Amino acid sequence: MTRSAPAWFAAARERISRGEAPVCVLGCGYVGLTLALECARAGSAVTGIETDEVRAKDLRAGANPVPDVLIPDGELAQLRDGGRLTFMTALDAPADVYVICVNTPLRDGSPDLRFVESAGESVARVLTEGAVVVLESTTYPGTTEELLRPILEEGTGLVAGRDFALAHSPERIDPGNRDWTMRNTPKVVGGLTPESTELVSAFYSRVCDNVVGVTSPRAAEITKLFENTYREVNIALANEMAITCHDFDIDPWEVLRAAATKPFGFTPFRPGPGVGGHCIPVDPQYLAWRVRGKVGRQFRLLETASDINQRMPSYVVQRAAEILNHEGKALRGANILLLGVSYKGGSGDVRESPALRVADRLVASGASVSFHDPHVPTASINGVVYDSQALDDAVLAGSDVVIVLTDHPDVDYARVLDRAPCVYDTRGVMERFDGSAPNLHRF
């Protein structure tokens, strides 16, 4: 017997498809703000909920407080004045579509879902029949059905799937990437019911060119974890191979370039000082935690890869000490300039940045540390706030070693190599220069 769609389904689908459904985005960081903007640009009336009062004030004033979200000057104010984009610190009115885009950090190695719970409770206070609720926050498989669903149902007396649509759609935003945007990056959607998947797919089809449906929220949740576990494992392999190449006195960057010429069966990943940011150091740990707790076993490959990547900052410090010793200097008391402290090139995001872990270890070892980063004006190192230094000749010449930790595109690396007495390149940015330069040490 074929199950019929809920009575409200057709009308909800029509409103969503025509852009007439009011949208509420909970959490206006780089994920939520990007989604809110795209929905408003597509003609929807959008309310962004941001509990950080300073950030919310900036957004209401038309200022962009999230540097990694690329917004043309004046657009926030234009959308606000046109009635399509409003920002508030609390949810106090119903919408047709609610999208939860809050942070899901780790706390003592375990998932911290307090922000998801709080957002769910906010939605439950105003949720009505026929609405759509989507969780975009990255989390372990089962969160949408086992954590969010009970909060919504118990707070309303409604039943997910019967009275409102519920789905998970993992965010795939790459901060600062101008080539792969929300519009051209495929969007995975997994609904609690086929109707939920259809409604949420209709919603995202207004802002995404390709929506990919899967059969459940759990499938969508683990898809995101698989993507980032794949990256962590392969980065760990590249790091372990780079260490091995150094042990054998082989240039790892030459090996990587040569291996990448194979047109099939090989995808190049670059070694570096570790992994950082909002995804790679965190998301795979959600999967490992869930496997241990739900199945009672280890995800051994993932946990080994994570261990390798977490040890890379210590390896960088060890290599820096060896390089200084080769120059007749000790790590303790050495003047070390760190080139870049954000976790990725072109970004000012320092969350989980391996560069800061390198800095902490250097300071703890007695080195005198400074840094230059064109995207990070200040950074906390071992509890002390440091200012980014100008990359002038005196700073370069006065350093015992310059350690390249972030591959920012807007740095004159040729000048760095020419002025600094010693350069340790952990990112391969000096590949295009003469590898025989006596002051250059490769990762």
Residue ranges and their predicted role:
Residues T2-F443:
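Structural/interface elements that position substrates and couple domains in central-metabolism enzymes
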